[in-house]
Amino acid sequence: MADHMMAMNHGRFPDGTNGLHHHPAHRMGMGQFPSPHHHQQQQPQHAFNALMGEHIHYGAGTMNATSGIRHAMGPGTVNGGHPPSALAPAARFNNSQFMAPPVASQGGSLPASMQLQKLNNQYFNHHPYPHNHYMPDLHPAAGHQMNGTNQHFRDCNPKHSGGSSTPGGSGGSSTPGGSGGSAGGGAGSSNSGGGSGGSGSSNMPASVAHVPAAMLPPNVIDTDFIDEEVLMSLVIXMGLDRIKELPELWLGQNEFDFMTDFVCKQQPSRVSC
């Protein structure tokens, strides 16, 4: 079949100007002008058509060589399909389905950030300190996930519940209805189940009140983040709720060590702990 096409092209281009009758572009019949005096004018076009001929089937739909060039060139075409010399080779095939997509913009990365915030939602904490300078407005569209009301975490460290260490002396609660603090600089109650709401979080935006642990300042890096629902589900899954004698859950480590040492000394027949 190739010999038949070459014979047809030999009859079509009898003079064989510059040896172009052996070119794949002319064997495929991709030339636009049949007369020989147009070949020298269209020689770069024919050469680029032959170059792009094997890439046309990667495009979408059926197209000829010229439309394939313009489709593959995208917005970088000049002079109706002739590529500029400084154009990168990757830019000529930027619409091919085998090429990587362009660099994602900020709008493309926003859904991924929102999905990560959904996955990390249990690590957001309602903290009494207003960290305005620690909370840059990175994702304003995802702010509704940070100021939600379904936050089940509270700060279980009582040393952060006082109101005298906050700017202006206003204390705050780690959960709505949690431990309260006096607005004049007085110490708040350490009872985490108190009924009075904190007054320190009222002068803060809702998007700043819930900040992730990685964005907290270093002075509260030792704050305990405890989710009671996750903890209880872990206890139920391990069967610890059915075990009645677990002194290490109710006593400190020193008392537990003392009890185990005392019991082991009283009963020497047992294996030592």
From Swiss-Prot:
<feature type="region of interest" description="Disordered">
    <location>
        <begin position="137"/>
        <end position="204"/>
    </location>
</feature>
<comment type="similarity">
    <text>Belongs to the CITED family.</text>
</comment>
<comment type="function">
    <text>Transcriptional coactivator of the p300/CBP-mediated transcription complex. Acts as a bridge, linking TFAP2 transcription factors and the p300/CBP transcriptional coactivator complex in order to stimulate TFAP2-mediated transcriptional activation. Positively regulates TGF-beta signaling through its association with the SMAD/p300/CBP-mediated transcriptional coactivator complex. Stimulates the peroxisome proliferator-activated receptors PPARA transcriptional activity. Enhances estrogen-dependent transactivation mediated by estrogen receptors.</text>
</comment>
<feature type="compositionally biased region" description="Gly residues">
    <location>
        <begin position="165"/>
        <end position="200"/>
    </location>
</feature>
<keyword id="KW-0804">Transcription</keyword>
<dbReference type="GO" id="GO:0035802">
    <property type="term" value="P:adrenal cortex formation"/>
</dbReference>
<dbReference type="GO" id="GO:0005634">
    <property type="term" value="C:nucleus"/>
</dbReference>
<keyword id="KW-0539">Nucleus</keyword>
<keyword id="KW-0010">Activator</keyword>
<dbReference type="GO" id="GO:0001666">
    <property type="term" value="P:response to hypoxia"/>
</dbReference>
<dbReference type="Pfam" id="PF04487">
    <property type="entry name" value="CITED"/>
</dbReference>
<dbReference type="GO" id="GO:0003156">
    <property type="term" value="P:regulation of animal organ formation"/>
</dbReference>
<dbReference type="GO" id="GO:0045893">
    <property type="term" value="P:positive regulation of DNA-templated transcription"/>
</dbReference>
<protein>
    <recommendedName>
        <fullName>Cbp/p300-interacting transactivator 2</fullName>
    </recommendedName>
</protein>
<dbReference type="GO" id="GO:0035360">
    <property type="term" value="P:positive regulation of peroxisome proliferator activated receptor signaling pathway"/>
</dbReference>
<dbReference type="GO" id="GO:0007530">
    <property type="term" value="P:sex determination"/>
</dbReference>
<dbReference type="InterPro" id="IPR007576">
    <property type="entry name" value="CITED"/>
</dbReference>
<dbReference type="GO" id="GO:0003714">
    <property type="term" value="F:transcription corepressor activity"/>
</dbReference>
<keyword id="KW-0805">Transcription regulation</keyword>
<dbReference type="GO" id="GO:0003682">
    <property type="term" value="F:chromatin binding"/>
</dbReference>
<dbReference type="GO" id="GO:0003713">
    <property type="term" value="F:transcription coactivator activity"/>
</dbReference>
<comment type="subunit">
    <text>Interacts (via C-terminus) with SMAD2. Interacts (via C-terminus) with SMAD3 (via MH2 domain). Interacts with LHX2 (via LIM domains). Interacts with WT1. Interacts (via C-terminus) with EP300 (via CH1 domain); the interaction is stimulated in response to hypoxia. Interacts with PPARA. Interacts (via C-terminus) with TFAP2A, TFAP2B and TFAP2C.</text>
</comment>
<dbReference type="GO" id="GO:0060972">
    <property type="term" value="P:left/right pattern formation"/>
</dbReference>
<dbReference type="GO" id="GO:0043627">
    <property type="term" value="P:response to estrogen"/>
</dbReference>
<keyword id="KW-0221">Differentiation</keyword>
<keyword id="KW-0217">Developmental protein</keyword>
<dbReference type="GO" id="GO:0030154">
    <property type="term" value="P:cell differentiation"/>
</dbReference>
<keyword id="KW-0678">Repressor</keyword>
<dbReference type="GO" id="GO:2000020">
    <property type="term" value="P:positive regulation of male gonad development"/>
</dbReference>
